[in-house]
């Protein structure tokens, strides 16, 4: 076949594919206009930096997992709040029936506009998620949690019945169907997951996540959330220092770690991570216990310096602008 004939045959094939499957079903990479990854901030400056692209990528699946009470739901709710701030629509599939509206509101979530579902079975929850995502009107959907997506057969069965691999098959089937729709509609899908321990593991990490391997494969980003230490004010515990490790990242280099303060009743402390990142970039000077900015002392000890930034939003905004500029220069 001559070169011109090949070219004509290819053009005819491309037109046929577009006619059958719609515009954009196939394209040359050089023709694709939107090569930049569109993202939504995570609500944490440190996590945005660790993710490498400034937030969660649209049209991708994100898994957030970790031990109990480590801050997984808090991290997900901050993402919901950020989407809503930008005029987006958010849905929350509360399979655990543990949603706290007052706490979500404290984190900046507009609960009046939040679409909430508390499904009875795993199939119901995933079908609701599929319907919402397929509509193209949802910007972010959070499933809390994968472990609570119990298959219908298990709910309708008797206690003690064996249902080996049932949940894994359910997740595998659902993700095969959802992944394409999520990419097409540019929806951010966040799956919160718990941790289980494998029985009889003598060597290596005994920890695993429920729901089989499908979610690990389909996820663009996997975040491991763990408590590092308690934050105390005098003798009272007022929050936790949390480490968020990017264990998988298909859009930037993985294995980066973000350390954030999650304060009880308030969520991620923006001032705490801003102070740490500003000190790391030498925007804020740290000498001993004292923090200073432009030669002026802003606090003795980290908590006092955080308080200063919270009470002086103009200074905080100025520092944040410089920190973001520094992060862009690093990239």
UniProtKB/Swiss-Prot annotation:
Belongs to the RecA family. The gene is recA. Coiled coil: none annotated. It comes from Lactobacillus delbrueckii subsp. bulgaricus (strain ATCC 11842 / DSM 20081 / BCRC 10696 / JCM 1002 / NBRC 13953 / NCIMB 11778 / NCTC 12712 / WDCM 00102 / Lb 14). CDD domains: RecA (cd00983). It comes from the Bacteria. ATP binds at residues 66-73. InterPro entries: AAA+_ATPase, DNA_recomb/repair_RecA, DNA_recomb/repair_RecA_CS, P-loop_NTPase, RecA-like_C, RecA-like_N, RecA_ATP-bd, RecA_C_sf. One of its GO terms (molecular function) is ATP-dependent DNA damage sensor activity. It is found in: Cytoplasm. GO terms for cellular component: cytosol. SUPFAM superfamilies: P-loop containing nucleoside triphosphate hydrolases (SSF52540), RecA protein, C-terminal domain (SSF54752). PROSITE patterns: RECA_1 (PS00321), RECA_2 (PS50162), RECA_3 (PS50163). This is Protein RecA. Its main location: cytoplasm. Keywords: ATP-binding, Cytoplasm, DNA damage, DNA recombination, DNA repair, DNA-binding, Nucleotide-binding, SOS response. SMART domains: AAA. Can catalyze the hydrolysis of ATP in the presence of single-stranded DNA, the ATP-dependent uptake of single-stranded DNA by duplex DNA, and the ATP-dependent hybridization of homologous single-stranded DNAs. It interacts with LexA causing its activation and leading to its autocatalytic cleavage.
